[in-house]
Amino acid sequence: MIDFKFNYADISIVPERRSRVDSRSQTDPYDENHMLPIYASPMDTVVCKENLKDFLDNRINVIVPRTIKIEERIQLAYDRSIFFAVSISEAEKIADYVEGFEIDQYIPMFTGRKYKICIDIANGHMDRLLRVARRLKKQNECEITLMAGNIANPETYIDYEESGIDYIRVGIGGGSACLTASNTGVYYPYFSLLKEIYEIKKRMGGNAKIIADGCIKGYRDIQKALIYADYVMIGGLFNKAIESAGKTTYGKRYWNVNGNKIFRPLTTLFTYGKEIKRENFPRVMKLIKEGKLVVWKQYRGMSTKEAQKNIDENAKLKTAEGKVFYQKVEYDLKGWVENETDYLRSAMSYTNSFTLEEYKESPTVVNMSVAYNQ
């Protein structure tokens, strides 16, 4: 018997026969902190210290990325009560510090404070990650909320839950700038992966939050993911916002590589040419909306050589599992968030759901031809 697995494009949400929701304005699409159930991916072409406030002001959860120096990363996150990303070796150093070992002095004093730490690695199935997670959660010097991942085996949820991890990033190989699936063959269709993890969570009475990370191609995929996920993490869609961290250039031409047109302005191949400064973004967005200017954002996976070099200029370069390309700027964060909030409210009203918790229990989905779901 063939065990079919599904991606977001393979399914569609069926409205409830009857809905108690008279207007989508009656629904509550926010979490307990009054934020949307969405995280901006900690990628260096999505999030930077200059746009943290932009995301937070628009009710988008954000993680301080690893491209910022560790001292500043920790302080930025602590001041805003948000997550900061660390490598697994940085997580081990923090564990050493709070356990009283002699370590590098750049780690600030953690005693008596509350921190939110995201162990940001590609392969979240390593025993090494689980070991450091247990150390961080068992120490008594400070209160740590821990996010980790990514995982793509449903049963790994059990190990994360038992290790005390609070937020689990789910999904490998589905990002638009990720080449892991195509080059390694490692992949698990996202919708089925989330469903199976959610069922394991319910069966064992788990508390860890599920974050759907990757394969989000548009608004509707967010609504589909939230049937089983507590949050959705977004990279490529946020890169298309004028406020994103990617290098911002303007021009209408494409760069032709091996006969394929990719989103790279010809004049910026090596120098990034006509780069737009952040202080000019509001004026530029006005010109974009008026159809007077075409603007591009550089987007790249965090497993690219360029991104790894940005994290550590002394990094030993290896074979990349990501790609670099340009995307056209299509909106500002405020406009995107207004759309997504209304679309999520609408999906909730169709499925007889006043809250996100009710939404998880409500939707019926059907498998359908991808051709009908475009």
Task: Kindly give the residue locations of the regions a language model identified.
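Active-site entrance/lid segments in N-terminal catalytic domains of soluble metabolic enzymes
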Residues: 1-209, 236-241
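Alpha/beta catalytic cores of nucleotide-metabolism and tRNA/nucleoside-modifying enzymes
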Residues: 1-19, 185-212, 216-374
